[in-house]
Amino acid sequence: MTSKYAIILAAGQGTRMKSKLYKVLHPVCGKPMVDHVLTEIEKNNMDEIVTVVGHGAEMVEKTLGDRTKYALQAEQLGTGHAVLQAEKLLGDKDGMTLIACGDTPLFTAKTFEELFEYHKSKGAVATVLTAHAENPFGYGRIIRNEIGIVEKIVEQKDATVEEATVKEINTGVYCFDNKELFAALHQIKNDNAQGEYYLPDVMEIFQKQGKVVAAYQMKNFEESMGVNDRIALSNATKVMRRRINENLMRQGVTLIDPDTTYIDIDVKVGSDTVIEPGVQLKGKTEIGADCYIGAHSEIIDSVIEDGVKVTSSYIEDAVMHKNSNIGPYSHLRPKAEIGENAHIGNFVEVKKATIGKNTKVGHLTYVGDATLGRDINVGCGTVFVNYDGINKHHTTVGDYSFIGSASNIIAPVNIADHAYVAAGSTITDDIDAHDMGIARGRQVNKKGYFDRYPVAEAARIAEEKAKEE
């Protein structure tokens, strides 16, 4: 079986991005561009992958880790020079080598597989992946002879007027006989408009040597979209987003408006889940089956189990167990865990807290650094006061307890099972099982005090107007 290798070119500075972030690390649907390329290449069961890095090498290595080896291109002298930097790692190996660019995130594993198969079937030393472009400006042109054989690849800046009219373009992806590739790379020259060593020049070298050079024209030009600036990044993101959304819909997920639904590449969604417009699902989020994700919700790196309803809320690094619900306008912060069939209502914030099964936190409440048991009712306006200005403190509320509205729970306290907190209390001590905690001043009614305040005059005027109606 023929060995398969790959070289990913990721050394370009990407000055047109006008960014501090290394170009190939700009994300497309939640994953850096170069990671998209590596992931699709990996699906072809490669024997070894080398990524050529330059500016920002450490950041690329941190992102991709040990999934690939690395070669450094210290000076940017062209694509041919970049590939040559991998010679120490691959130069003596027999087999086929795929070359792809780290700023082309839309290529699929299937396209790479088809290129490998076509290359083998033609017995070629080099095969370039081409595409038909209605507007080929900026791309290298595939120049064929009268019988259709590839003679050379000409870059835009070096093309004659006639060559510039050719619409078959170089996608920047190749398959080579590995040893033949590195032998030819030592023969290319930099006598061109850019003064660089172009990888495509090896094609002409092979032709002059009488070796087989092939071209495989892919069906979908869209895959070949490279990213050199923010506009191209936006266009690539649109294509990837459409691809993700259509795949989910084929798997039984309902997207009310796919054009306004933003789902990252690693997100998983179960069947019969309904996603409304304006939703953003990011990172490693997992959504179960039969869920409802309401308009303008944003969910990041969270687990949403089957049957959960999320209404216009923000959830990050949290877990919602099956048949629970949240919203509208609530916020689950990191390490929030919402139990089965629990209810988190509107304008509620939960941070680093566990909410038990069937527990209800209806509205206008903050729950931080707390463990709440099952079947608890937390009244409106309750605040779990967890921070003393230096340290965070934990509160525990036992099963079947009741927290009255407008209560302040000053951590650290333990409220036992079957305990009751009277509305309006500020709780600073533990409450035992079956006890009620009440901490508020007694009501005192001041006779005639209403008439002492300015509101009394306003009320008198309103009352007179009401009589005239």
Curated annotation (Swiss-Prot):
Ligand binding (UDP-N-acetyl-alpha-D-glucosamine): 9-12, 23, 73, 78-79, 140, 155, 170, 228, 333, 351, 366, 377
Pfam entry (one): Hexapep
GO biological process: cell morphogenesis; cell wall organization; lipid A biosynthetic process; peptidoglycan biosynthetic process; regulation of cell shape; UDP-N-acetylglucosamine biosynthetic process
Entry's localization field: Cytoplasm
Residues binding Mg(2+), per UniProt: D103, N228
Essential cofactor(s): Mg(2+)
Highest taxon, organism lineage: Bacteria
Positions annotated as active site in the UniProt record: H363
Signal peptide: none
Pathway involvement of the protein, from the record: Nucleotide-sugar biosynthesis; UDP-N-acetyl-alpha-D-glucosamine biosynthesis; N-acetyl-alpha-D-glucosamine 1-phosphate from alpha-D-glucosamine 6-phosphate (route II): step 2/2; Nucleotide-sugar biosynthesis; UDP-N-acetyl-alpha-D-glucosamine biosynthesis; UDP-N-acetyl-alpha-D-glucosamine from N-acetyl-alpha-D-glucosamine 1-phosphate: step 1/1; Bacterial outer membrane biogenesis; LPS lipid A biosynthesis
The UniProt record lists the keyword Magnesium: yes
Single GO cellular component term: cytoplasm
InterPro entries, per database record: Bifunctional_GlmU, GlmU-like, GlmU_C_LbH, Hexapep, Hexapep_transf_CS, NTP_transferase_dom, Nucleotide-diphossugar_trans, Trimer_LpxA-like_sf
Reaction(s) catalysed (UniProt annotation): alpha-D-glucosamine 1-phosphate + acetyl-CoA = N-acetyl-alpha-D-glucosamine 1-phosphate + CoA + H(+); N-acetyl-alpha-D-glucosamine 1-phosphate + UTP + H(+) = UDP-N-acetyl-alpha-D-glucosamine + diphosphate
Sorted UniProt keywords: Acyltransferase, Cell shape, Cell wall biogenesis/degradation, Cytoplasm, Magnesium, Metal-binding, Multifunctional enzyme, Nucleotidyltransferase, Peptidoglycan synthesis, Repeat, Transferase
Residues engaged in binding acetyl-CoA: N386, Y387, S405, A423, R440
Region (Linker): 231-251
Subunit structure comment from the entry: Homotrimer.
Family (UniProt): In the N-terminal section; belongs to the N-acetylglucosamine-1-phosphate uridyltransferase family. In the C-terminal section; belongs to the transferase hexapeptide repeat family.
Protein name: Bifunctional protein GlmU
Native source species: Ligilactobacillus salivarius (strain UCC118)
